[in-house]
From Swiss-Prot:
Entry's family note: Belongs to the GatC family.
Organism listed in the record: Clostridium botulinum (strain Hall / ATCC 3502 / NCTC 13319 / Type A)
Enzymatic reactions: L-glutamyl-tRNA(Gln) + L-glutamine + ATP + H2O = L-glutaminyl-tRNA(Gln) + L-glutamate + ADP + phosphate + H(+); L-aspartyl-tRNA(Asn) + L-glutamine + ATP + H2O = L-asparaginyl-tRNA(Asn) + L-glutamate + ADP + phosphate + 2 H(+)
Enzyme class, UniProt record, top EC level: ligase
Function: Allows the formation of correctly charged Asn-tRNA(Asn) or Gln-tRNA(Gln) through the transamidation of misacylated Asp-tRNA(Asn) or Glu-tRNA(Gln) in organisms which lack either or both of asparaginyl-tRNA or glutaminyl-tRNA synthetases. The reaction takes place in the presence of glutamine and ATP through an activated phospho-Asp-tRNA(Asn) or phospho-Glu-tRNA(Gln).
Secretion signal, residue range per the UniProt entry: none
GO molecular function: asparaginyl-tRNA synthase (glutamine-hydrolyzing) activity; ATP binding; glutaminyl-tRNA synthase (glutamine-hydrolyzing) activity
Gene3D superfamilies: Glu-tRNAGln amidotransferase C subunit, N-terminal domain (1.10.20.60)
Top-level lineage group: Bacteria
Record GO biological process: glutaminyl-tRNAGln biosynthesis via transamidation; regulation of translational fidelity; translation
Name of the protein in its database record: Aspartyl/glutamyl-tRNA(Asn/Gln) amidotransferase subunit C
Subunit text: Heterotrimer of A, B and C subunits.
Keywords: ATP-binding, Ligase, Nucleotide-binding, Protein biosynthesis
Entry EC number(s): 6.3.5.-
Amino acid sequence: MSVSKKDVEYVAELARLEFKEEEKDSFVNDLNKILNYMEKLDELNTDDVDIVVNPYYIENKYREDNVEKSMELKEVIDNAPESLEEYVIVPKVID
Protein backbone atom coordinates (compact mmCIF):
# COMPACT_ATOMS: atom_id res chain seq x y z
CA MET A 1 0.00 0.00 0.00
CA SER A 2 1.26 3.45 -0.79
CA VAL A 3 0.05 7.00 -0.44
CA SER A 4 -0.33 9.17 -3.52
CA LYS A 5 -0.44 12.92 -3.87
CA LYS A 6 -4.15 12.55 -4.62
CA ASP A 7 -4.63 10.85 -1.22
CA VAL A 8 -2.87 13.70 0.57
CA GLU A 9 -4.98 16.27 -1.29
CA TYR A 10 -8.17 14.37 -0.41
CA VAL A 11 -7.36 14.22 3.32
CA ALA A 12 -6.28 17.87 3.28
CA GLU A 13 -9.61 18.80 1.72
CA LEU A 14 -11.52 16.83 4.36
CA ALA A 15 -9.56 18.61 7.09
CA ARG A 16 -9.99 21.96 5.33
CA LEU A 17 -6.21 22.39 5.08
CA GLU A 18 -4.18 23.94 2.30
CA PHE A 19 -0.60 22.96 1.50
CA LYS A 20 2.03 24.08 -0.99
CA GLU A 21 3.05 21.56 -3.64
CA GLU A 22 6.40 20.86 -1.95
CA GLU A 23 4.58 20.22 1.35
CA LYS A 24 2.28 17.72 -0.37
CA ASP A 25 5.30 15.96 -1.87
CA SER A 26 6.93 15.87 1.55
CA PHE A 27 3.79 14.35 3.10
CA VAL A 28 3.63 11.70 0.39
CA ASN A 29 7.27 10.82 1.00
CA ASP A 30 6.95 10.78 4.80
CA LEU A 31 3.71 8.78 4.85
CA ASN A 32 5.12 6.19 2.45
CA LYS A 33 8.20 5.82 4.65
CA ILE A 34 5.94 5.23 7.66
CA LEU A 35 3.81 2.67 5.82
CA ASN A 36 6.89 0.84 4.52
CA TYR A 37 8.26 0.69 8.03
CA MET A 38 4.95 -0.65 9.35
CA GLU A 39 5.02 -3.42 6.73
CA LYS A 40 7.77 -5.01 8.83
CA LEU A 41 4.96 -6.17 11.12
CA ASP A 42 3.89 -8.56 8.35
CA GLU A 43 7.16 -10.44 8.90
CA LEU A 44 6.29 -11.28 12.50
CA ASN A 45 5.23 -14.82 13.28
CA THR A 46 2.28 -14.47 15.64
CA ASP A 47 0.97 -18.04 15.38
CA ASP A 48 1.83 -18.86 19.01
CA VAL A 49 0.66 -15.54 20.45
CA ASP A 50 -2.67 -15.38 22.27
CA ILE A 51 -5.14 -12.78 21.08
CA VAL A 52 -5.56 -10.02 23.65
CA VAL A 53 -8.38 -7.53 23.21
CA ASN A 54 -7.33 -5.26 26.07
CA PRO A 55 -4.09 -5.89 27.94
CA TYR A 56 -5.08 -3.55 30.75
CA TYR A 57 -7.91 -4.85 32.84
CA ILE A 58 -8.59 -1.68 34.77
CA GLU A 59 -10.17 -1.92 38.17
CA ASN A 60 -10.92 0.85 40.58
CA LYS A 61 -8.08 0.26 43.04
CA TYR A 62 -8.29 3.54 44.87
CA ARG A 63 -11.59 3.54 46.73
CA GLU A 64 -15.00 1.99 46.88
CA ASP A 65 -17.54 3.49 44.52
CA ASN A 66 -20.13 4.57 47.07
CA VAL A 67 -23.27 6.52 46.34
CA GLU A 68 -23.41 9.67 48.43
CA LYS A 69 -26.11 12.24 48.91
CA SER A 70 -25.72 15.18 46.55
CA MET A 71 -26.84 18.77 46.88
CA GLU A 72 -30.54 19.53 46.88
CA LEU A 73 -31.87 21.18 43.70
CA LYS A 74 -32.81 24.34 45.60
CA GLU A 75 -29.26 24.67 46.94
CA VAL A 76 -27.81 24.27 43.43
CA ILE A 77 -30.18 26.88 41.95
CA ASP A 78 -29.53 29.28 44.85
CA ASN A 79 -25.77 29.05 44.24
CA ALA A 80 -25.94 29.37 40.45
CA PRO A 81 -25.10 32.82 39.04
CA GLU A 82 -28.11 32.59 36.71
CA SER A 83 -31.01 30.16 36.54
CA LEU A 84 -34.43 29.66 35.01
CA GLU A 85 -36.88 27.52 36.96
CA GLU A 86 -34.87 24.37 37.71
CA TYR A 87 -32.16 24.92 35.07
CA VAL A 88 -28.76 26.56 35.49
CA ILE A 89 -28.02 29.02 32.68
CA VAL A 90 -24.44 28.90 31.42
CA PRO A 91 -22.62 30.85 28.69
CA LYS A 92 -22.87 29.45 25.18
CA VAL A 93 -19.68 27.59 24.27
CA ILE A 94 -20.58 26.04 20.89
CA ASP A 95 -21.71 27.88 17.77
